[in-house]
């Protein structure tokens, strides 16, 4: 968004709790200076009722708080491993132990960013990441909080269990 109608980059996310899903881990790892806007909602039947908006001002000096010792190259090797797992349930099951060991080896337990590999029984092979609102606040990252009231028609997600 930076350069179009804004002098800043923004990442806009929604959550119905404390956890903020941040998408692709390598893309997020490259970003060091942006405003993270989080809309918090309550699911009321087929509507999401947004009640709180947080804006966290993520800056380069927060890199060690967010990522700890998880550098881009280390994460890229892990992502490459995950993406090259063959499609299907057999490969999903056969690689489970190794995936866990590798994830534990690269994870920095002191970092706010958490790693979430997505390997299903079909062909999904990607690595995402997340943060928690309360941990961002506790870490002292500058933020603004606003009470809002917006309702969006948006039924709960339905997952295909086949």
Q: What spans do the regions from the language model cover?
A:
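Nucleic-acid endonuclease domains
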Residues: 2-8, 12-162
